[in-house]
Amino acid sequence: MSEKEKICIVTGVGPDKGTGAEIAKIFGKKKYKVAMIARNKKKLNDLEKKYKNIFSYPCDVGNLEKFKKTLKKIKNNLGPADVVIHNAPSASRGSILKLNPDDLELNFRVNTTALLHLVRETLPSMLSQKKGSILITGNTAATRGKSHWGFFASTKAAQRILAESIAREFGPKGIHVAYFIIDAAIDTPRTRPYMQPDKPDDYFSKPTAIAEEMYKTVLQDKSTWSFRVELRPFGETW
């Protein structure tokens, strides 16, 4: 009897060389069938054509009803997920006196409520197998509220606490939940010119390295599971 194909779902997959794309690619290389979820259909389709074992499922995770339908479609097409990775962010920046309160709700919906639905749609199958991995991409905003980042930070903190609650409830049942706090500027074609164009390479975390750490976490022995995983470049002040 042949071994069941492993299935991975990744939200927030952007352009090639970005974190989401690198996560999808490394799991695809490891023989997972990877369902990529993001709003940009063209970018997903381009990745699907270029790399093996990764499949395009365009969807805005902030549209919760469509997101749930997409997750059901993935299960019907590929099978129940063994690994799910919530990488989709919504990040509003600005003074709390000026930001639209609707943006706070949007940040919460993408960062936290979408995680809840991702887990609810995929966890039952994991529980039936008594194994599975749920990984979440976070950052230092989940641990502190900096000026002008109140909307983003408050919803990422909620995301982290939700993830911890899921880990405490379902870890004893064989489900590994890990929250990645990425304390770094990530080296992507979009981030480098926008944030710190003159910084040396050592200032940035590489998307490929982040993806590799996520894959390593899935392989951890049950006797040494991580929950809070902090990643930063060696030169980062903290």
PLM segments and residue spans:
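Canonical Rossmann dinucleotide-binding motif of NAD(H)/NADP(H)-dependent dehydrogenases/reductases
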Residues: 2-34
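Substrate-binding pocket helix/loop in short-chain dehydrogenase/reductase
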Residues: 95-96, 100-105
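C-terminal helical subdomain
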Residues: 172-175, 179-181, 196-238
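A short, exposed helix-loop element centered on a Lys and neighboring polar residues
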Residues: 119-120, 164
